[in-house]
């Protein structure tokens, strides 16, 4: 999990490094309470339970967030500072989010409703239409469907 700064709007992001599924939610602030809300949102709507959850060392992933991590993950890890390789999957997605959807603009809090619509459309595209080389040119949803049918 990570965050992307868009001025007065912050995108909390999460990626499953196996299926390439993502979760994104926009907030007006960058607090551990927001981090906790994003944790619950992501796991209740997308990820269910994982073996390992990794975040950067930001304050949004401390306090209330850390006290709830083990409801959703067996293990928790904080990436080492200045070691971007440890966050390469989420950093790659964050770059795609900027390049393909929200850009490099600085937004105001009152922009959130229109940004949420844009983000919702992008996530539908990302999960259902956008192929990934690491998934053998399948979308995340196609890959997940193939996984289930192979079991």
What are these regions (language model features)?
Residues 1-3, 17, 29, 57, ...:
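Residues immediately flanking
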Residues 24-48:
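Active-site beta-loop-alpha junctions of metal-dependent nucleic acid enzymes
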Residues 55-70, 78-100, 113-116, 143:
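RNase H-like two-metal-ion nuclease catalytic core shared by retroviral integrases
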Residues 4-6, 33, 58-60:
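Short beta->alpha connector loops
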Residues 21-25, 77-79, 103:
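Short small-residue beta-strand/loop micro-motif enriched in glycine and branched aliphatics
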């Amino acid at each position: 999990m990570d965050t992307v700064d868009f001025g007065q709007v912050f995108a909390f992001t999460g990626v499953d490094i196996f299926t390439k599924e993502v979760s994104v939610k926009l907030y007006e602030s960058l607090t551990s309470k927001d981090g906790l809300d994003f944790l619950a949102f992501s796991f209740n709507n997308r990820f269910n339970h994982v073996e390992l959850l990794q975040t950067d060392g930001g304050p949004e992933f401390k306090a209330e967030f850390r006290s709830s991590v083990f409801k959703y993950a067996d293990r928790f890890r904080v990436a080492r500072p200045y070691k971007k390789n440890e966050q390469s999957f989420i950093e790659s997605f964050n770059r795609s989010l900027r390049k393909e959807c929200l850009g490099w603009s600085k937004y105001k809090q009152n922009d959130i409703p229109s940004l949420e619509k844009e983000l919702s459309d992008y996530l539908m595209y990302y999960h259902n239409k956008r192929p990934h080389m690491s998934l053998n040119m399948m979308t995340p949803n196609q890959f997940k469907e193939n996984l289930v049918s192979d079991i």
